[in-house]
């Protein structure tokens, strides 16, 4: 990450950070006791899910192995569901939005740790104390895209900062200051007092209280991916981690995070599990082969991956989603299909943020043949699920067209757009 070569020193958190950690842990334990959030064996929540064939599945998670999940229904019936047959399991489709409270660690591919205390950070690793059951974690710095240390309280400003830290191309480390300044240099570390950079060959200490965020060079970020199946776990605080070697022990999911640290999460703290296998491929992970954008008024806005076209998380019908394609009418996206691609599935609609003015028509074509055409949709309309056979097709085309008012507030969402293989 453009690291300057310095002696390997540990910047230990001082008394203030230690006191904050103790207070957070005490408040977390108290809130869980009051709210009764901590689950014990036999009281785990029920999850509902979606299989790749479109059928629903539900039950309490009782076992996880390398390639399947076991669910117990209310009728005490056990069902083993292989990862490759399952799209998702969710306790509540209203995934938590990314909130400005606290500090946040941004990892590649949408993984993140929300509402943490960032402690000692060197040019090799960062120590964080999570307010969730994840507790204390040490993350290799090569796995980190950035740190939001002091988040803006206004949601639009927070999303803009998040997008810069997560998606900006930068050849070196960047420090964003509360006064609007932007500093670049080689990262040396941070503690509870200062962020340390090497600027023009000289070490510089920057008062941490004035630092909003730190972004690392994304070209040298390395995030291990398992050779076969793994799980994405989403927690109630909005954190999401990819994990391997998952299993269930006494009402907890025990696993290894993709950055190598063992974790334990009570099932009651999980709100969603996404099996990641080669059977379900999200279009946000596939390169679009061709796209065309033509606005009605002003300059068109191109496709955004895993964000709405104006840079926010997806919200459809009051529900929040992590993955998808954000477009604006009029947009055409073309994907060359691969041998083994069987079905295309997505949830489409106009994002809740569009308000009453947005109006969009969604169309799906295969090999230029119309397969789906929706009526004009606004944010007041319920999202529509699309599920079509593409096994004989070579080209998948997704189109958003002008509805009733040109492209005014046309925030067109293709939520969880995916190929079933």
How would you name each of these model-derived features?
Residues 48-49, 393:
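Long alpha-helical scaffolds
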């Amino acid at each position: 990450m453009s690291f300057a070569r310095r002696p390997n020193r540990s910047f230990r958190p001082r008394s203030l950070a230690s006191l904050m950690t103790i207070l957070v842990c005490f408040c977390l334990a108290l809130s869980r006791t009051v709210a009764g959030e901590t689950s014990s064996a036999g009281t785990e929540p029920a999850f509902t899910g979606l299989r790749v064939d479109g059928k629903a599945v539900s039950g309490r998670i009782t076992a996880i192995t390398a390639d399947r999940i076991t669910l117990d229904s209310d009728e005490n019936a056990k069902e083993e569901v292989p990862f490759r047959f399952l799209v998702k399991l969710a306790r509540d489709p209203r995934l938590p939005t990314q909130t400005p409270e606290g500090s946040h660690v941004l990892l590649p591919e949408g993984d993140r740790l929300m509402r943490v205390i960032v402690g000692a950070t060197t040019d090799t690793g960062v120590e964080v104390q999570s307010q969730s059951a994840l507790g204390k974690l040490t993350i290799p710095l090569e796995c980190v895209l950035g740190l939001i240390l002091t988040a803006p309280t206004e949601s639009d400003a927070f999303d803009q900062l998040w997008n810069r830290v997560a998606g900006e191309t930068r050849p070196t480390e960047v420090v964003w200051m509360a006064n609007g300044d932007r500093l670049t240099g080689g990262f040396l570390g941070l503690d509870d007092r200062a962020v340390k950079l090497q600027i023009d060959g000289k070490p510089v200490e920057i008062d941490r209280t004035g630092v909003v965020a730190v972004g690392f060079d994304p070209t040298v970020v390395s995030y291990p991916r398992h050779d076969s199946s793994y799980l994405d776990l989403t927690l109630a605080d909005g954190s999401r981690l990819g994990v391997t070697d998952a299993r269930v022990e006494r009402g907890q999911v025990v696993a290894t995070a993709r950055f190598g640290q063992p974790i334990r999460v009570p099932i009651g703290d999980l709100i969603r599990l996404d099996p990641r296998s080669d059977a379900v491929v999200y279009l946000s992970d596939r390169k679009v082969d061709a796209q065309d954008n033509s606005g009605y008024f002003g300059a068109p806005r191109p496709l955004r991956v895993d964000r709405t076209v104006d840079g926010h998380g997806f919200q459809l019908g009051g529900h929040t989603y992590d993955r998808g394609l954000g477009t604006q009418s009029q947009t055409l996206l073309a994907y060359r299909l691969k041998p083994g691609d069987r079905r295309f599935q997505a949830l489409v609609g106009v994002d809740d943020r569009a308000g009453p003015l947005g109006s969009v028509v969604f169309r799906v074509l295969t090999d230029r043949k119309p397969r789906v055409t929706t009526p004009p949709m606004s944010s007041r309309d319920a999202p529509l699920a699309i599920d079509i056979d593409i096994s004989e097709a070579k080209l998948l085309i997704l189109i958003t067209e002008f509805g009733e008012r040109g492209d005014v507030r046309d925030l067109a969402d293709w939520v969880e757009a995916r190929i079933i293989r």
